[in-house]
Amino acid sequence: MAEHYEHPYPSSELESQYPFVHYEHERFTEEEMRNRAHDFYEQMERRRSVRMFSSDPVPKSLIETAVKTASTAPSGAHKQPWTFVATQNPEIKHAIRVAAEKEEEINYLENRMNKEWQEALAPLGTDHHKEFLEIAPWIVVLFEQRYETNVDESTSKNYYVKESCGIAAGFFIAALHHMGLATLTHTPTPMNFLNEILDRPKNERPFVLFPVGYPLKGVKVPDLKRKDLDEVLFSC
């Protein structure tokens, strides 16, 4: 199909009202694209969730770069409805662990989790013990901003908040793995205690918690198999 657009973007009217710039894009040969795609896939295919971390320190600059990468994610109306809170403070990490384990004890030991959920988790061997929340050098919590608060205390709506935060979380995980760090998507249920411990405003809600660090030497992970391509991709 010829590259003819009846409705060019941006329109001259739109461009007269809002700033636009030329998109800087480098086009590779098909061979280069295949090589880049294969290398990236091979790297990401080795990514695993880790539950045992080394306590070796991780520079703050690496966490900052991962968050900057996450913040390049697309979001509804470009509202970027997320806040990342990172801490390496031992007292704060201890408080998070205590609160998380309290909720998880109810989930695992008092059957707040239904039987089907527990059976699904069985191959992972998870339980209410969350030592990694103190041992990992960093805890990073991604909060979703349900709405924005303005200087005059008025509020503005955010759009596709969960979808936007989910994409940002994926970028964050990929950035960590790319630089040689490990993480885990941890969602103790409920997570409201994180607002209090991390002193977050009421318009923010915990979305996911990431312990971040180097994997413990010799750590084992479940021998899981990912779905084949023909199970996740259908071409029309």
How would you describe each model-predicted region?
Residues 69-71, 123-128, 194-196, 219:
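Glycine-rich, charged/polar anion/phosphate-binding loops
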Residues 2, 86-165:
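Glycine/small-residue-rich phosphate/adenosyl-binding loop
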Residues 1-65, 88, 98, 106, ...:
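N-terminal accessory segments that position/regulate proteins before the catalytic core
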Residues 47, 66-70, 146-197:
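Small-aliphatic-rich amphipathic alpha-helix that forms the alpha element of a beta-alpha
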Residues 78-81, 134-136, 205:
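Short, basic and Ser/Thr-rich N-terminal targeting/leader segments
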Residues 104-113, 199-222:
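A glycine-rich helix N-cap at a beta->alpha junction
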Residues 2-32, 123, 127, 208-236:
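C-terminal helix-cap and adjacent tail motif
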